[in-house]
Curated annotation (Swiss-Prot):
Family designation: Belongs to the glutamate 5-kinase family.
GO cellular component: cytosol
GO aspect biological process, one term: L-proline biosynthetic process
Chain's gene name: proB
InterPro entries linked: AceGlu_kinase-like_sf, Asp/Glu/Uridylate_kinase, G5K_ProB, Glu/AcGlu_kinase, Glu_5kinase, Glu_5kinase/COase_Synthase, Glutamate_5-kinase_CS, PUA
Gene3D superfamilies given in the database record: Acetylglutamate kinase-like (3.40.1160.10), PUA domain (2.30.130.10)
Protein name according to UniProt: Glutamate 5-kinase
SUPFAM superfamilies per UniProt: Carbamate kinase-like (SSF53633), PUA domain-like (SSF88697)
Species name: Psychrobacter arcticus (strain DSM 17307 / VKM B-2377 / 273-4)
């Protein structure tokens, strides 16, 4: 067990107790190891069983979105390959082949219960670009209004750096944010999050409930922890990302009988990662700090840099000396000190690059004259949407 964990975890966190959910919309993510019998091809029996559980929720009026891995593994089987390819082109080809079987199987399993399904293949670029993000959200909203169940997967055929273990955990969390889901369920091959690896330590306890932002979770599931190789780290990170939008996450074994319906009904199976208003802000800042793709740059003077870094203030337009790049309102940009050239923060900007150029170096009282329309925006980047990087 990680150092200090005994003193960090309260016994109440191990107690089975009913969970009071009010769920209208749920995301269910199922990993490759469950879907493919650990790489031996799609487990159609299991898929049909999960479809039956999803159908029960559907009949109750609960909207379900499914994030399904397994395309690459199914492609390997269909091509009779002895092992998973290492070359990117071969991985992408396997994803293209396997995706056909994956969607075909889910469609067949769901249509038996009168549920129409659809395929949605996404990349991180689709979700980091505001215009495509809004288009994707609109499509998902329409599908749900039509009572169609979206089956979402990473578009491994065209991505370069996203074919890696655990990525669909993140994709599911981002989908939860897009549609304002009430619950995110991650089905895995482990019963939940443990204080140690239960395969090695018979005294390991399963954590029944914890805040998604609890730091010690990374200690026991991080890269240096005993559970890191099992992919639990990506699931905890996904739980934190879901927390940013106020969505709780349950990490649970997909092999448990009626697991999906039992989780939604509030039964204490698996590990529940909870969130609150303060956690939303913390999680949002962590997500911003980890954002790899900047849409542009705001160059700020020394006074603005000091206000942001030392006093944790919002970035005001008057402190912005230069705007670089082409971005939309809501995109993530870097904030750079004009004297040192150092990135001091990243944040979600309240203006498009065009409008940001117009209000840069201007005081708030000038905004109506510059932009018109009774302009209500007063900050370039709000402090709740800003994360320091130095």
């Amino acid at each position: 067990m990680a150092v200090g964990i005994e003193n960090t975890i309260e016994e109440a966190r191990f107690v089975e107790q009913a969970r009071n959910f009010d769920i209208q919309r749920v995301i269910v993510k199922i990993g490759s190891s469950l879907l493919t019998n650990n790489g031996r091809g799609l487990d159609r029996t299991a898929i049909y069983e999960w479809a039956k559980q999803i159908a029960k929720l559907h009949k109750q009026g609960i909207e379900v979105l499914l994030v399904s891995s397994g395309a690459v593994a199914e492609g390997v089987v269909r091509m009779n390959l002895e092992e998973r390819p290492k070359k990117l082109a071969a991985l992408q080809a396997c994803a293209s082949i396997g995706q056909m079987g994956l969607i075909e199987t889910w469609w067949s399993a769901l249509i038996q219960h009168g549920i129409q399904s659809s395929q949605l293949l996404l990349t991180h670029d689709d979700l980091s670009n505001r215009s495509r993000y809004l288009n994707t959200t609109g499509a998902l909203t329409q599908l749900l209004e039509w009572r169609v169940l979206p089956v979402i997967n990473e578009n491994d055929t065209i991505t370069i750096d996203e074919i890696k273990f655990g990525d669909n955990d993140t994709l599911g969390a981002m989908a939860a944010a897009m549609v304002n889901a009430d619950l995110y369920i991650i089905l895995t091959d482990q019963e939940g999050v443990f204080t140690d690896n239960p395969r090695d330590n018979p005294n390991a306890k399963m954590i029944r409930q914890e805040r998604a932002m609890a730091d010690y979770l990374f200690d026991i599931a991080g890269d240096g922890g005993k559970l890191g190789r099992g992919g639990m780290l990506t699931k905890i990170r996904a739980g934190r990302l879901a927390a940013m939008g106020g969505c709780p996450t349950v990490i649970v074994s997909g092999a448990i009988d009626d697991v999906i319906t039992r989780v939604v009904s509030g039964e204490a199976v698996g590990t529940l990662l909870t969130t609150n208003d303060q956690d939303k802000i913390i999680a949002r800042k962590q997500w911003l700090a980890a954002h790899l793709r900047m849409s542009g740059s705001l160059i700020v003077d020394a006074g603005a840099a000091k206000a942001v870094v030392e006093h944790q203030k919002s970035l005001l337009p008057v402190g912005v000396s230069e705007v670089r790049g082409d971005f939309d309102e809501g995109d993530v940009v870097e904030i750079v000190h004009q004297d040192t050239g150092e990135r001091i923060a990243v944040g979600q900007v309240n203006f498009s690059s065009r409008d940001a150029c117009r209000v840069a170096r201007e005081r708030t009282e000038q905004f109506d004259r510059i932009l018109g329309n009774n302009e209500e925006r007063v900050v370039m980047v709000h402090r709740d949407n800003l994360a320091l990087t130095m």
